[in-house]
Amino acid sequence: METTKPSFQDVLEFVRLFRRKNKLQREIQDVEKKIRDNQKRVLLLDNLSDYIKPGMSVEAIQGIIASMKSDYEDRVDDYIIKNAELSKERRDISKKLKVMGEIKNGEAKSE
């Protein structure tokens, strides 16, 4: 079987397409994040509407908002902690994979 060596133009086209694909992937993720954020805002307003009743005092409404804010801040803190734990696990796995790769490369070189 004969394999043809890719021309310089083919390589450039491959790189261009690969970069475009990555850019599109980043844009898609960005738009998905914006969609999620706006859906959360709509849900927040719905929740707030459920709590606020006609004739409530400004202080009562401010109390509800303060309580909701506190709940959301607690969730953010929990997510920050969870993210740190996941990042630590990912780093540990990366180190193990690197060591395994070095051992594998060392065995291949000695053969």
UniProtKB/Swiss-Prot annotation:
Source species, domain of life: Bacteria
Subcellular location: Cytoplasm
Gene Ontology annotations for the cellular component aspect, listed alphabetically: cytosol
Keywords: Coiled coil, Cytoplasm
Coiled-coil region(s): 14-41
Keyword S-adenosyl-L-methionine: no
InterPro entries per the UniProt record, alphabetical: DUF496 (IPR007458), UPF0265 (IPR053375)
Record carries keyword Cytoplasm: yes
NCBIfam families listed in its UniProt record: PRK05423.1, PTS_reg_TmaR
Family statement drawn from the similarity comment of this UniProt entry: Belongs to the pole-localizer TmaR family.
Annotated PANTHER family: UPF0265 PROTEIN YEEX (PTHR39591:SF1)
Function recorded in the entry: Pole-localizer protein involved in the regulation of several cellular processes.
Protein name: Pole-localizer protein TmaR
UniProt source species: Escherichia fergusonii
